[in-house]
Swiss-Prot record:
Its main location: membrane. Residues 33-61, 119-128, 179-187, 295-311, 360-364, 430-435 are extracellular. It is found in: Cell membrane. This is Solute carrier family 2, facilitated glucose transporter member 11. Facilitative glucose transporter. It comes from Homo sapiens. GO terms for biological process: D-glucose import; D-glucose transmembrane transport; dehydroascorbic acid transport; fructose transmembrane transport; hexose transmembrane transport.
Length: 496
């Protein structure tokens, strides 16, 4: 609680979190969820547009194909954005990268807003690709920016705010997409274009806030700018100790250049970090949480929830993830990262198993549908308290300043690739396994919990230098000398 009070007292840091989040991971969650409400309206618009051009309506299977393209272009854009994030973070800095990233949102909002008037569903497709690029960049750079700007005792909580804004974006998108608001047949272009609002808020607020002190000192070599940023972020406290830590980290990175993504896989000194990033990053996307959202509507419908009320029940699922993200942010610096990950995956295994049994027994015992409905909420709560937020800060905490942008690129690209694969494969898994569709996902949850327990070191309350030393000891258990991956040549550039 002392750390939480310090966060509240550090008003500039709190404002930085809000400004980065509203135009960052909030956009990811918001654009992920708002596309669900106008599904039928956009399909009708696509069919009508095609008929106006050719004189013939589109066959049903082609309408579905067009819709699948509109949905799938979002994660594809996210993949491009993730690959763009590393070079942007190094060339422009963390803060400027987030600001420049809004170009994609503004362009997409214009395309969405005028798509119906122009009679072009292609504008919707291009807009979805652009908001995907925006999400891919922000999902990587925001945790990096906030993790580098926070003091070590608040680093986990501050970085976890990315998960809070993602969940908040999902809920806000579900609310704005209600039929009573912008989810109607006439307002859907405004619904899609509403992503401009959080982008405008970030453009108005983030320029007034400081850049990452670590970037200013280690990448730019500007001690005065670093000290000025620290003074604004920390207030009137003593900065000597933190500045000394930053100087030590700068000395450790002296003579090094920024790592390229493929170089992370070539060095034994980064073996455990990269393995943890790949295993736990894949587990977060393959654990079945996104599939729970996809399956929720049918479970609520079978449980007797009126069709008109299902949209409100879906908002409840998003609210669960938001609630647990807030709880996780509060407790992460008390219980640590490992406990949240192990506990989250273990609880997901438990609730997923009960959910599978409930689906199998629904024909014999109708009341098990209510049990399945409860398991959906419990599964989402368990995901939100652990994997949803903690996984996102691994790239920031496990890698040093020179490897961090490349690690974020790898983590982000992996996340979007897995999201695409799950989106493509889930319908076939559902058809092939029926009520047992969650068995593969449960296996992933078990593996995630076991890997965390055996191989992931705790980073709570440690400086980046302390984390690097511990990981070096784990990667080279029989050797005590300094890291072997440092270059002897002094390289001024940090270009990827």
């Amino acid at each position: 609680m002392r750390a939480l009070r310090r966060l509240i007292q550090g008003r500039i840091l709190l404002l930085t979190i809000c400004a980065a989040g509203i135009g960052g991971t909030f956009q990811f969650g918001y654009n992920l969820s708002i596309i669900n409400a106008p599904t039928l309206h956009i399909q009708e618009f696509t069919n009508e547009t095609w008929q106006a051009r050719t004189g013939e309506p589109l066959p049903d299977h082609l309408v579905l194909l067009m819709w699948s393209l509109i949905v799938s272009l979002y994660p594809l854009g996210g993949l491009f954005g993730a690959l763009l994030a590393g070079p942007l973070a190094i060339t422009l800095g963390r803060k400027k990268s987030l600001l420049v990233n809004n170009i994609f949102v503004v362009s997409a909002a214009i395309l969405f807003g005028f798509s119906r008037k122009a009679g072009s569903f292609e504008m919707i497709m291009l807009g979805r690709l652009l908001v995907g690029v925006n999400a891919g960049v922000s999902m990587n750079i925001q945790p990096m920016y906030l993790g580098e700007s926070a003091p070590k005792e608040l680093r986990g909580a501050v970085a976890m705010s990315s998960a809070i804004f993602t969940a908040l974006g999902i809920v806000m998108g579900q609310v704005v997409g209600l039929r009573e608001l912008l989810g109607g047949p006439q307002a859907w272009p405004l619904l899609l274009a509403s992503c401009l609002v959080p982008g405008a808020l970030q453009l108005a607020s983030l320029p007034l806030l400081p850049e990452s002190p670590r970037y200013l000192l280690i990448d730019c070599g500007d001690t005065e700018a670093c000290l000025a940023a620290l003074r604004r972020l920390r207030g009137s406290g003593d900065l000597a100790g933190e500045l000394e830590e930053l100087e030590e980290e700068r000395a450790a990175c002296q003579g090094c250049r920024a790592r390229r993504p493929w170089e992370l896989f070539q060095h034994r000194a980064l073996r455990r970090q990269v393995t943890s990033l790949v295993v736990l990053g894949s587990a977060m996307e393959l654990c079945g949480n996104d599939s729970v959202y996809a399956y929720a509507s049918s479970v609520f419908r079978k449980a007797g929830v009126p069709e008109a009320k299902i949209q409100y029940a879906i908002i409840g699922t998003g609210s669960c993830e938001l609630l647990t993200a807030v709880v996780s942010c509060v407790v992460i610096e008390r219980v640590g990262r490992r406990v949240l990950l192990i506990g989250g995956y273990s609880l997901m295994t438990c609730w997923g198993s009960i959910f599978t049994v409930a689906l199998c027994l629904q024909s014999s015992f109708p009341w098990t549908l209510y049990l399945a409905m409860a398991c959906i909420f419990a599964f989402i709560l368990s995901f939100g308290i652990g994997p949803a937020g903690v996984t996102g800060i691994l790239a920031t905490e496990l890698f040093d300043q020179m490897a961090r942008p490349a690690a974020c690129m790898v983590c982000g690209a992996l996340m979007w690739i897995m999201l695409i694969l799950v989106g493509l494969g889930f319908p076939f898994i559902m058809e092939a396994l029926s009520h047992f569709l969650y068995v593969p996902f449960l296996g992933v949850c078990v593996c995630g919990a076991i890997y965390t327990g055996l191989f992931l070191p705790e980073t709570k309350g440690k400086t980046f230098q302390e984390i690097s030393k511990e990981l070096h000891r784990l990667n080279f258990p029989r050797r005590a000398q300094g890291p072997t991956w440092r270059s002897l040549e002094v390289i001024q550039s940090t270009e990827l």
